[in-house]
Amino acid sequence: MKKLISLLLGIAMMTMGASLAEGALVTYFSHAGENYNVGVVEEGNTAKLAKVIAEQTGADLFEIVPVVDYPQSYDECLEAATAEQREGARPEYMGDVENWDQYDTIFIGYPIWWGEIPNIVYTFMENHDFAGKTVIPFNTHEGSGQSHSQRDIENTLPDATVLQGLAVRGATAQNDADATAKAVSDWLSGLGM
């Protein structure tokens, strides 16, 4: 019986990996400019992590780009994000995912801002039908790990299957490509991909 279960799990993992690229999307929000613990960067920490995930899975990419940019300065961005959290704001973003229905697996990436998912990511989640989709969160942080973002996504998307997410320190995503690639590879392997 154990051999049969192992065989079936192996087949399921191979099938999932083979079909992942065709039906997978990596969508993410990232902040360039001044980032905590990494300084001023041209490409945000989460963008770097998202691109590694897309490269390793063959998934398509969609960046959640705000209509109104967040301030480049860390302190000003902190003030803007805190105000959004306090007010429950839903900032608008540019463009949208083409052919949403073709994607079965959605990776959702974001930085953890003061223990929370940035509100613009909630805008994206609330604007799309995730029923029947597999959602895989990932985030960058500087000490808070996933915070409670896994639970928040599960609560926001009750009709989706939410798999275990990945948390990578922003400084690692920004400055250590090898460690980031290994963290992603290990995580995907743990998910059976």
Residue map of PLM features:
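Helix-loop-strand module that forms the ligand-binding subsite of alpha/beta enzymes
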Residues: 71-161
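Short, well-ordered secondary-structure micro-motifs
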Residues: 37, 74, 148, 175-176
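N-terminal beta1-alpha1-beta2 submodule of the flavodoxin-like/Rossmannoid cofactor-binding fold
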Residues: 22-105, 115, 182-193
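Extracytoplasmic/periplasmic soluble domains downstream of a signal peptide or transmembrane helix
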Residues: 23, 29, 62-64, 140-142, ...
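Sec-dependent N-terminal signal peptides of Gram-positive bacterial secreted proteins and lipoproteins
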Residues: 3-21
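Glycine-rich phosphate/pyrophosphate-binding loop and the adjoining helix
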Residues: 161-193
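Second-shell loop/turn segments in exported
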Residues: 34-41, 108-111, 136-143, 170-174
